[in-house]
Amino acid sequence: MKILLSNDDGIHAEGIQILARELRKFADVTLVAPDRNRSAASSSLTLVEPLRPLRLPNGDYCLNGTPADCVYLALNGFLSGQVDLVVSGINAGVNLGDDVIYSGTVAAALEGRYLGLPAIAVSLDGRQHYESAARVVCELIPRLHGQILQRREILNINVPDIPYEEIKGVKVCHLGYRAAAAEVVKQQDPRGEAIYWVGPAGLAENEQEGTDFHAVKNGYVAITPIQADMTAYHSLQSLQDWLESE
């Protein structure tokens, strides 16, 4: 199996390095990742400057672009041979609910799906037990490849930040959602000018049983199938009826 591995935390992030090590025990892995942290880059592509892949001594590549750039360029540019699967992660921090809209981790997987390949995104609810998340992924891939992963979807996997032995199991979940993130951090630069930082994500507002929030909070791996089609199908008919009533 040939796997393209990327992330949004950057090529030197602990999560992607641990996952690459474990995946290489059973697969041919090509790692192409941003040269720095590109968290929350979503599916943005770099269109106003050239992309420069740098091949490192160990054969991995870093790129001066976004996670989506990495997957797009690797699959359309410099990689030779057939890729069987795109994997993105391990992200430092969960991508639950509305997070998937902003997530570069999820976007890298979606870019693989756009280009016709099965793909998964994996995130850890913290920064400690990356080995747990890597083990989960390595156990799931042989079971999923050639079956679920052939659909026009990606799988968004979130793992609790606990030792592997304490994980209670795996649950298939739908996305929850967060409250609005209204906090902005205002500071001053050395010249006294105002500068701003985007604050933390909103708290979980829907973490009922069946959501990804609930699963991870209670010690389960959450797997959510995600599709790029964001059409609100349940509203199509009511919208059509409204237009025709005018």
UniProtKB/Swiss-Prot annotation:
Enzyme Commission code(s) on record: 3.1.3.5
InterPro entries: SurE (IPR030048), SurE-like_Pase/nucleotidase (IPR002828), SurE-like_sf (IPR036523)
Cofactor: a divalent metal cation
A GO CC term assigned to this protein in UniProt: cytoplasm
Family: Belongs to the SurE nucleotidase family.
Function of the protein: Nucleotidase that shows phosphatase activity on nucleoside 5'-monophosphates.
Protein name, entry field: 5'-nucleotidase SurE
Organism per entry: Pasteurella multocida (strain Pm70)
Lineage: Bacteria, Pseudomonadati, Pseudomonadota, Gammaproteobacteria, Pasteurellales
